[in-house]
């Protein structure tokens, strides 16, 4: 069983908090239309190995802050269809509890750059959930830039904020945009 706490920002920018308990059902098939993998960069190989070892087939929507080149990603994916995405929001799992948030959009690799069958079905899936898609010219470059900006913001927050009071630090950074210049 998995306890889920989600801050849903699709309709209200401040978010709506929901909590529920879900029963986890282990896979019943070996082939899927879509496998969503959301892991840190250093865990992609492990996730792909787990799918391979389990005999699980299907294209992967990879939500990951990947720093490498396309050739490295292709090697890690070992021939599996892959679509790069970035959820903009996020979360974490600790033991049997998922705490996360979702916004009204995600970043998704453009169709002409994706190595992914069924792109239209993924578009329809997000649309049915009230989540719009932003498609940068080059998804890998967008991820690199996003991660670099986050590192800069984190450095400034660490310099001017208080690691013991992250809420106050966020307010300082949000209202003191000149700190970021």
Model-identified regions with their sequence ranges:
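Short, mixed-charge, low-aromatic patches
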Residues: 2-6, 26-29, 75-83, 132-141
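Internal alpha-helical scaffold of NAD(P)-dependent oxidoreductase catalytic cores
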Residues: 54, 79-81, 99-181
């Amino acid at each position: 069983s998995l306890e889920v706490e989600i801050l849903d920002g699709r309709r209200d920018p401040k978010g709506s908090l929901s909590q529920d308990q879900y029963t986890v059902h282990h896979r019943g098939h070996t082939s899927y239309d879509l496998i969503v993998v959301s892991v840190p960069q250093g865990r992609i190989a492990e996730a792909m190995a787990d799918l391979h070892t389990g005999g699980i087939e299907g294209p992967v929507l990879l939500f990951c802050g990947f720093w490498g080149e396309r050739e490295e990603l292709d090697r890690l994916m070992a021939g599996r269809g892959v679509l790069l995405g970035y959820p903009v929001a996020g979360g974490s799992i600790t033991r049997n509890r998922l705490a996360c948030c979702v916004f009204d959009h995600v970043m998704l690799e453009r169709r002409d750059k994706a190595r992914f069958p069924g792109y239209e079905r993924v578009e329809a899936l997000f649309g049915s959930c009230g989540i719009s898609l932003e498609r940068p010219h080059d998804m890998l470059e967008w991820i690199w830039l996003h991660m670099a900006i986050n590192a800069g913001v984190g450095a400034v927050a660490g310099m001017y904020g208080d690691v013991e009071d992250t809420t106050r630090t966020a307010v300082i950074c949000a209202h003191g945009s000149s700190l970021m210049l």
